[in-house]
Amino acid sequence: GESKLAGEKSIAEAGIPYLILRTSWIYSLQGKSFLRTIKKLASENDMLRIVDDQIGAPTWARSIALATHKILEQYLRNKTEPSLSGIFHLTCQGQSSWHGFAKEILSLSDASQNTKLLPIPTSDYPTPAVRPIYSLLSNDKSEKAFAFKMPHWHDALKDCISSTPT
């Protein structure tokens, strides 16, 4: 987190137009992601302990890619427009806990429907990196500047699970 912030500050202080896109809770059908991990673990276990007190917006990588394409088209056409320069957030609409996200993944996929999900507090799941309890980002500035809305995370997850990995 600190190195990302330092990089953002350096870019902002350069005195030229810039575009920084922030996102969070990214998942995909490819690579290492919470979605793939939950599906795999559900196929191997009868019960999963999932953190239920961290809140964020699950965001499909494809949703980010599509939004980034729209943003770049507008930015490149209007680079000198001050409202299109700066830091912008790109996360799906809505919010969930990791437990809620896992529950939705299993309900929409062919993963084991018999796997029980046990909600646990963050304190019961220590990790090397400290994770914020509340990590929602507001898309208001992005929506106003670039005139678009990110999809709701439920809708993006349905589309992701029903899509074929490319």
Please tell me what each predicted stretch does.
Residues 3:
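Active-site helix of classical SDR
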Residues 6:
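Active-site His/Glu-centered metal-binding helix of metallohydrolases
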Residues 10-57, 62-70:
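NAD(P)-dependent short-chain dehydrogenase/reductase
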Residues 19, 48, 57, 94, ...:
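Residues that recognize and position ribonucleotide moieties
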Residues 22-23, 51, 92, 121, ...:
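A secondary-structure boundary/capping signal
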Residues 67, 74-128:
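Mid/C-terminal beta-alpha module of Rossmann-like enzyme folds, strongest
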Residues 87, 97-103, 120-160, 165:
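Conserved C-terminal active-site "lid" loop/helix of NAD(P)H-dependent oxidoreductases
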